[in-house]
C-alpha cells in the first residue's frame, strides 16, 4: 500500500499525521492472514523554504532520561520536490 501526502507548507508534526494514516491502514488489516506493508511518502512542493522540521517521532518529544530505549521511534520520508537538482530529476 502506497500513500502520498502532498504538502505545500512544512508541518512540524507530520510524523504524527503519517503514523495516524499508516496505523489506520494496518488496523484495517488486523484480521488478514498476511499484513501488507504501508509506505507513505510526503511530497513537499514548497518553494519558499526547505523542510526544516523533524522527520522522526522522537525528535518531537522531550523524553525523560532512561526512557528513550522504551519509546518507539518512527521515521517519515519527505521528498522536497521543488528543491531537486537537475541530476536528481533526470533519474526519473
Description of each model-found segment:
Residues 1-92:
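Conserved single-residue anchors adjacent to enzymatic active/cofactor-binding motifs
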Amino acid at each position: 500500500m502506497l500513500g502520498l501526502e502532498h504538502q505545500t507548507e512544512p508541518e512540524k508534526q507530520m510524523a504524527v499525521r503519517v503514523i495516524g494514516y499508516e496505523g489506520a491502514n494496518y488496523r484495517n488489516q488486523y484480521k488478514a492472514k498476511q499484513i501488507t506493508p504501508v509506505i507513505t511518502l510526503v511530497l513537499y512542493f514548497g518553494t519558499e523554504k526547505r523542510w526544516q522540521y523533524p522527520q522522526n517521532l522522537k525528535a518531537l518529544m522531550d523524553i525523560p532520561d532512561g526512557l528513550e530505549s522504551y519509546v518507539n521511534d518512527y521515521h517519515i520520508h519527505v521528498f522536497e520536490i521543488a528543491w531537486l537538482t537537475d541530476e536528481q530529476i533526470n533519474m526519473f
